[in-house]
């Protein structure tokens, strides 16, 4: 979801996060909540729950309406100010298979991988910042600062 948010709205600049194990019997965090601010000043939240059935939901609110993508992004809805939802159905695809196929194509020199090295590094920096923030009781983390320090 981090890469999708940045692709659509721009780079995440800073974030704070709480993450902990609440339900699962294995020693991994199963509940995570993060508040973030993009370089543009837009704010948002990311939440993950590994102890629930798999589900992906992206909802973007704006002054002129909202857009929502759900059911593994195969269903997109838009609602303008005071309007009914407009639903768009997209043919579902296995995104993991597509990702591996794209990686193989890039390795074989057929096509460039759709995610640049800089984008991948920034995505990892954000995940690392979420982990660090949670370990420091939700302290705000500056992503550009982490990248400049080479912390990732």
Question: Predicted regions: what is each one?
Answer:
Residues 1-4, 56, 99-102:
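Hydrophobic alpha-helical segments typical of transmembrane helices
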Residues 39, 105-152:
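C-terminal helix-rich "cap/oligomerization" subdomain common to oxidoreductases
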Residues 40-42, 54, 65-66, 83-84, ...:
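Short acidic/polar mixed-charge low-complexity motifs
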Residues 58, 74-82:
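Short polybasic amphipathic segments
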Residues 12, 42-43, 64-66, 73:
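Structural motif
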Residues 89-101:
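Active-site loop of classical SDR/Rossmann-like NAD(P)-dependent oxidoreductases
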Residues 54-55, 61, 67-71, 98:
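C-terminal substrate-binding/catalytic lobe of Rossmann-fold NAD(P)-dependent oxidoreductases
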Residues 1-43, 49-53, 118:
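Rossmann-like dinucleotide-binding domain that binds NAD(P)(H)
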């Amino acid at each position: 979801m981090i890469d999708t948010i940045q692709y659509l709205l721009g780079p995440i600049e800073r974030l704070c996060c709480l993450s902990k194990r609440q339900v699962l019997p294995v020693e991994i965090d199963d509940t995570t909540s993060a508040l973030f601010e993009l370089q543009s000043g837009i704010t948002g939240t990311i939440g993950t729950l590994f102890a629930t059935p798999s589900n992906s939901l992206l909802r973007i609110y704006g002054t002129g309406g909202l857009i929502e993508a759900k059911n593994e992004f195969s269903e997109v809805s838009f609602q303008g100010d005071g309007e009914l939802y407009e639903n768009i159905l997209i043919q579902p695809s296995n995104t993991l298979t597509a990702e591996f196929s794209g990686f193989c194509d890039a390795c074989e020199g057929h096509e460039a991988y759709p995610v640049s090295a800089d984008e991948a590094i920034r995505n990892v920096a954000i995940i690392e910042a979420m982990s660090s923030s949670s370990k420091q009781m939700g302290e705000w983390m500056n992503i550009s600062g982490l990248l400049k320090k080479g912390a990732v």
